[in-house]
């Protein structure tokens, strides 16, 4: 079924389709409409939806639900992740039970924010996957995939919509809500759930050992795709990939394009593209995360690329 949806509503639909049982959040543009949409449906859908007193509490509510085997999501704007950073960073070590998605909506150009910090930095800091949607359809699709990735690797997964994705409207293909599993069950396991140094050290090693598998899984995602037309190339992430596609089409230019939608970025995907171009322009919103990665890979795969 197709519906004309706001990006944030597409994310909310994805949460319902994934069968999440708990959604918590703290309001802040550009993320607020996710909980706004879900709250009136909570009783009908059998989902616990709440505005928490702050982002840290919202994060901990979602963590608690996840540890009972319930899929959960937490929503906030980018600066809210500062408030929630303590439990977020430690959760990467302790891991999840049911899939858990952390939705941190960034605000390039400070439309309604005090800074332009980039949530992708937090994902890299915590060593967890981050999905960067370019439009409302990708926002819905990535939400569904994020829950599956979270359960596959036992870590939270970040969804990072930006303002023009959260507040754009588009025709979105949606499905029906997934039936939730049996009631929540909490299993006492101090070695995995109590963040003492004696537990954290081996869990850190475990997290590091997951990184190769995470990168290999993300490498195969359709959101990382390229078209090679000439030796002049553009590498763009998130909604910047749409901007690049429109610009190239408008100029009727023979320009190669690699679109990036997932982090950590695949060395192979970027390296293979760099070997086919002699000049490259990187386009992304906010911090030069893709640019820094491209520079690093270029030294190995194509040192002469401009």
Spans of model-derived segments:
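Flexible, low-complexity linker and terminal segments
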Residues: 1-8, 12, 18, 133-306
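Thiamine diphosphate
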Residues: 1-136, 164, 226-228, 254, ...
